[in-house]
Amino acid sequence: MAKIVKFGDEARQKMLAGVNVLADAVKTTLGPKGRNVVLDKSFGAPTVTKDGVSVAKEIELEDKFENMGAQMVKEVASKASDDAGDGTTTATVLAQAIVNEGLKSVAAGMNPMDLKRGIDKAVNAAVAHIKSIAQPCEDGKSIAQVGTISANSDSHVGDIIAEAMAKVGKEGVITVEEGSGLENELDVVEGMQFDRGYLSPYFINNQESMSVEIEQPYILLVDKKISNIRELLPVLEAVAKSGKPLVIVAEDVEGEALATLVVNNMRGIVKVTACKAPGFGDRRKAMLQDIAILTGGTVISEEVGLDLESATLEHLGSAKRVTMTKENSTIVDGAGVAADIESRVAQIRAQIEETSSDYDREKLQERVAKLAGGVAVIKVGAMTEVEMKEKKARVEDALHATRAAVEEGVVPGGGTALIRAAAAIADLKGDNEDQNAGIGIAIRALEAPLRQIVSNAGGEASVVADKVKNGEGNFGFNAASGEYGDMLEFGILDPAKVSRTAIQAAGSIAGLMITTEAMIADKPSEGGAAAPDMGGMGGMGGMGGMM
């Protein structure tokens, strides 16, 4: 396949054109008065969004060189989204500002490598300043404010996320699903829930909800299949004497053993129910151990020299309540020792740090949540499917932002923190004039998000930027109301992690673009789609639309 190669200024101008097309589309969504972007979908209604990364993902340009520029900026948005969950539009605006100024300086004859070194110095100094001014975000009010700002000033979203975090703790799992109503709903599962239900409908004792509800049970955990009732008899007799109910969690309970348990339960000899252990293979062993630690029991496993016949009441865990439906089982208020649970959580966290697989990380985080907190589900409600998708994306963004805020703290929002970072590094010096120019480019670029927020709100960007620059600390501009004042008092907060990631991602990609000297792309085929028909096979022309 023949290639086209472009060099120097010609290559950079093409790349810049692509950067500007993508960034101009994305930056219209920035701020409380950001505009909507409508995305065409090949099936169904178009999607309306104010989410920067959704807009960026849609853009593919026809010119291959321009498209390379656009894709590199798209990478900035994706990086910000992956690392912090938000700040995609801010990162794109910063990258565009640095690239535009940087390429002008390269065209004026400055050394691209020194410009990049200067930009990197300024980025590192700005990130250090952001970290230094971050304030912890721990109370429900500030969590709600961060969620509200990230969900495009929708206070209902901020409040529901704060409520979810209050109920399941900072470590709890919060998931977002499409609801069936018109309003957002919060559904909280206390305790440990796993996706295995009762093994026989004959265990059901609540006919209304078709579930098994057992109070203050003993819990027997077995890492094997139970098919012979003789193995179970010693434990069953001991439990029957104690007068408490029994919950069995095993790899499986089948045949004679299951039939005997059902008969005992129905006759009221011993109140018992059984379910399969969650997970498979090594993950099942680990999750059984989690349940053991949560309930203060021991897993009966031949690997550790314990068999079912020698099990006693000391080996059994207990809990305040166990509920089982056809699909799920929930253990509430296990009797485990708090210190043991904490050390187990710390152990799983260490595994999260080490794993390179996203799937494993997600499963490990779920285990932490089940041990440490609980699980909350936010069900997003809307009138139409288009609105539902847009709203769900906003709630997910807001959730990521609040997690980032809890992790690294918050800074004044609305572009104010970046203006303060620019002022803090104004005296930074490089090793030569070209590096100083690079530092200057990055400092000026830090004003771009505030200017864009103001112009999206219909204000005069230069006037507002000067006024905010002349202020101190948290003094900034509230674009939603058009007022100046303390951003923290207005409740306009950005997670420090989001601001930091946006600066780093933008600086990194912009540095690469400024130092680009050649671009290579496939040569387009002659005539493209309008090639002459293939003799007698002219009828195949219509197949183009089928691809």
Swiss-Prot record:
Name under which the protein is recorded: Chaperonin GroEL
GO terms of molecular function: ATP binding; ATP-dependent protein folding chaperone; isomerase activity; unfolded protein binding
Function description: Together with its co-chaperonin GroES, plays an essential role in assisting protein folding. The GroEL-GroES system forms a nano-cage that allows encapsulation of the non-native substrate proteins and provides a physical environment optimized to promote and accelerate protein folding.
Residues noted as binding ATP in the record, renumbered to the chain: 29-32, 50, 86-90, 414, 478-480, 494
Origin species: Saccharophagus degradans (strain 2-40 / ATCC 43961 / DSM 17024)
GO biological process: one example: protein refolding
InterPro entries: Chaperonin_Cpn60_CS, Cpn60/GroEL, Cpn60/GroEL/TCP-1, GroEL-like_apical_dom_sf, GROEL-like_equatorial_sf, TCP-1-like_intermed_sf
This protein's GO CC annotations: cytoplasm
Main location: cytoplasm
